């Protein structure tokens, strides 16, 4: 077995590597695994494999982490790396990982600086208050500019960077960094083989002045963070390395500033100091402190759990993945307590008991079975049947529900039609597996056509899902054109609407009367529906109230204009009547359903469409064409700015107008422009577009 899980949580870091798709995230992660792999490989003589053998084998396999979380060791510290994807269609994956990590390394391209995807991931990290250090990568690249990149962190992210290193040389001559904390040069001169140790040198003469200037800025920032340090510094005393690092750590953990270091992962330069910075400045589970949840069945009652083995067990499932040998792996972050393989736990989210089969921590090149799961760590569990992303697992005797993750509804759909009966069966298996892994993947059956309709967060997302069905599950199917996931809502309040459901067909009949109010509504947590019972005096027996709610929710699946789901409404049940013999749960369910449909027709129903936040980067000479094209797609231009010598146009554009955009953009700009697109919000469609949508849906 590899190195044991560290139980001293001061020596544990749960981190993510965040980056734009091309900033070098995979290479950076590979290098971290290699350098830390060397560290723990040395202690493993029993398998006779040398480090170089392992590296060759990894080269063949290409360590692009397929695991959701990888454990490695550095200088007697344990680092659990949670993988975060770099593409915009997978922002949910990013949110999912940010929810369970304690700190992150934001990787930037030293030439491009902060790019659109970096901005988005940075904002998501801010939402979960994740402390970050910044690694300016690709310093060996033509046109790389460390100081420009630091400025873009200020200008584009509105963040406060704290420079801890300066680059020595640039582009092909990038040889190392000046360490401003210890005032020394760390160099990797010439072509550096992977795994080579750096040389510690004097600061080069041409950088002494600049290093002194940045060192002074660093010391002033450190001194201002603590009264005792301020007195010492301004009293002319030297601050020790420990004092400087301690102050930087405190400010980083509080997200007051973001330490900036640099290197070239590809050229093996700057990786070891980056790992040192992860240990020195990013928080451990004890820094993060207790996790807050609520009582099972009562969201008003808050419960906390400390990151300690002595507390009752609690964990959050953050990713489901398929494994070729073990089947379904459930990745969890354990927040408190401990648990053994074979133990039974409560899935508090679903109210079901689950038995844990085996427990693993994933290493770069193998699964490492462990004897227990303890607070502060990330594990893969085997054997959980009903647990999905966002579920809480806990001690049955001390239940807690941790804050779950909210996922956006899919904005784009395609129909999928299996070619043969055997494909139909395989499709069923594929859909079940993919839905377990990805909470933004939706499936429904079109009752009219009998086709299966799948939904996702963008064209690329759906392309990848369909491709996985073909490759992994061998499903041959015809895939339809992408369709927009429209919604319907109401714009006016209906103060009072009554509906009586009455049926008499010999014997006992059916009777239920409801009086409801309907109004537009959006919940604070993004909820799109609320039911309030205002019935008093037993006019409707208590046991029938949930049936009215259930009937209304059923009716919301198919709107009143074009059959799209109804969202953003509140239904208040005001009054009603019942019959001792003829009333039933079914009768009140029908009444609730019909009352909602009729009231919605009177409440100014409209169709909503998904708007995408589109960002186009283009050479200046094509700016006019790009803006004209976006306007013709019903786009609203939000902002224009200059970035790295190019122009950037930000706009909100309906998704329905963005199909095939990449081809049009390339032809208009001779392939020199690119764009990114992410879901922003739903908005009401104009009347003329609404008419077309309704006509298409109703066939009129």
From Swiss-Prot:
Protein family (similarity comment): Belongs to the TRAFAC class translation factor GTPase superfamily. Classic translation factor GTPase family. EF-G/EF-2 subfamily.
UniProt protein name: Elongation factor G
Domain tr-type G: 10-286
Location within or outside the cell: Cytoplasm
Keywords in alphabetical order: Cytoplasm, Elongation factor, GTP-binding, Nucleotide-binding, Protein biosynthesis
GO biological process, one term: ribosome disassembly
Role description: Catalyzes the GTP-dependent ribosomal translocation step during translation elongation. During this step, the ribosome changes from the pre-translocational (PRE) to the post-translocational (POST) state as the newly formed A-site-bound peptidyl-tRNA and P-site-bound deacylated tRNA move to the P and E sites, respectively. Catalyzes the coordinated movement of the two tRNA molecules, the mRNA and conformational changes in the ribosome.
CC per GO annotation: cytoplasm
Pfam families cross-referenced by the UniProt entry: EFG_C, EFG_III, EFG_IV, GTP_EFTU, GTP_EFTU_D2
SMART domains listed in its UniProt record: EFG_C, EFG_IV
UniProt superkingdom: Bacteria
PANTHER family xrefs: RIBOSOME-RELEASING FACTOR 2, MITOCHONDRIAL, TRANSLATION ELONGATION FACTOR G-RELATED
MF-aspect GO terms: GTP binding; GTPase activity; translation elongation factor activity
PROSITE patterns for the chain: G_TR_1, G_TR_2
Keyword Cytoplasm: yes
Binding-site residues, GTP: 19-26, 83-87, 137-140
